[in-house]
Amino acid sequence: MARRNFKVLYVSGESSPFVRVSSLADYMASFPQALEEEGFEARIMMPKYGIINDRKFRLHDVLRLSDIEVPLKDKTDMLHIKVTALPSSKIQTYFLYNEKYFKRYGLFSDISLGGDHKGSAERIIFFSVGVMETLVRLGWQPDIIHCHDWHAGLVALLAKTRYAKHDFFKKVKVVQTIHNVYRQGVFPSKAFQKHLDPEVCDALDMEGGEVNLLATGIKHADLVTTTSDRYARQLLDDPELSFGMDKALKACGDRFHGILNGMDTRQWNPSSDKLIKKRYSAEQPEMKLEDKKVLLEEVGLPFSEETPVVGVIGSFDQYQGAEIVKASLAKLLELDIQLIVFGSGDKEFDQALKETAEENEEKMAFRPEFTDAFYHQMIAGLDILLMTSRIEACGMMQMFAMNYGTVPVAYAGGGIVDTIEEVSGDKGTGFIFTDYTPEALTAKLQEALALFANRERWSALMLECMGRDFSWSTSAGQYAELYRNLLG
């Protein structure tokens, strides 16, 4: 008898190319496809933020998925679904939309991130209940609901409480994956008590009048995973690194697993990438120089083959390198490099970077606005990718970079060291600094620059990077085994 294809729903707050804030978006763009190749039927649900361009991504309405009722404790709101396929795949991606909750707003935010989180608790409640109601209307019955980060923690709880009695969800299993442990979805409990029944509220992870949605997802999931085995061990052993999640994770026992990220080697392939100007391969690495020229022209910096171009990419907050980038700028600009910073932080960070770039217009460029096309062009055109996150569960950007012959210089946080082999003699793929200080960062970058000056050795390093296998093949197989064991 042929084995039935199990159905897996992936719930996330972001996914490339539709909207990107963190590496979670890159993960969502490739991981479901890898699991389809393992014999699972995958679909995705995420919010339809107002910033997502319907025309660009070919989102279309589905008549039978319009006017879905989302029953809350104190009211019933209406939900509308738009759908498209994940690019280069047949994976259906469903966008949950309500004008009041999503038209004028960006991504979800919470207390821990500061900024404007007003209304986010109500939005996440609406989205989470909406996911469950959409599945019922759709008639697509998942075997597993795979929840990603705090954005989907409430979905895990709803599946195990309010909807557990529903015939449609009686057999469903829940997996919760941690990508960003310091982003935990912390909110005052008031909105949850207002909009959710006592049965659900009583099961929330709550302390001091605040709800923690990541902890809620961990508590109620059948399996909990994170994006590298090393990072999983660190979360269990280091309360500071886990931001207080170590107790919840220890309580999981053998339900907690670390599986290394992979990458989509079709989407991120310099020989076939449609988003870069000049394609190249390990057989023609010299063509990468053309992408360097294009990148520098795009940001308004002069081209020199001998001057290394160093890039920093991120959503810069206190854990993703905002402070160390600002503190290192003066020293970095003393080096014989050109520097491109791509991504934004708070207003103070953006203003400081903008002013520094204007004062050093021959050496530095700052691009705060994210576009997928520039992201690819930057990965292709850089000589060195400088990774400044203090906490990185695994990351995928260093994998993209190495696949394009761009050498990473990274802080040894989380699972980074599972994917970058420190350069030693003729071996290795990158440079890792272990002290999170501007001095250590600059010193390690200078090691890379010294090697860059030796063109023969640098070319060999580029080829070593491009020869590594970062595909999902191994990791997807590990997830497939977890899924099948969970389903019995």
Curated annotation (Swiss-Prot):
Ranges annotated as spanning the membrane: none
GO MF annotation terms: alpha-1,4-glucan glucosyltransferase (ADP-glucose donor) activity; alpha-1,4-glucan glucosyltransferase (UDP-glucose donor) activity
SUPFAM superfamilies: UDP-Glycosyltransferase/glycogen phosphorylase (SSF53756)
A matching Pfam family: Glycos_transf_1
EC assignment: 2.4.1.21
Gene3D superfamilies: Glycogen Phosphorylase B
Catalytic reaction equation(s): [(1->4)-alpha-D-glucosyl](n) + ADP-alpha-D-glucose = [(1->4)-alpha-D-glucosyl](n+1) + ADP + H(+)
Keyword list, A-Z: Glycogen biosynthesis, Glycosyltransferase, Transferase
GO BP field: glycogen biosynthetic process
Keyword Kinase: no
Enzyme class: transferase
PANTHER family per UniProt: ALPHA AMYLASE DOMAIN-CONTAINING PROTEIN, GRANULE-BOUND STARCH SYNTHASE 1, CHLOROPLASTIC/AMYLOPLASTIC
UniProt-recorded name of the protein: Glycogen synthase
Protein species of origin: Chlorobaculum tepidum (strain ATCC 49652 / DSM 12025 / NBRC 103806 / TLS)
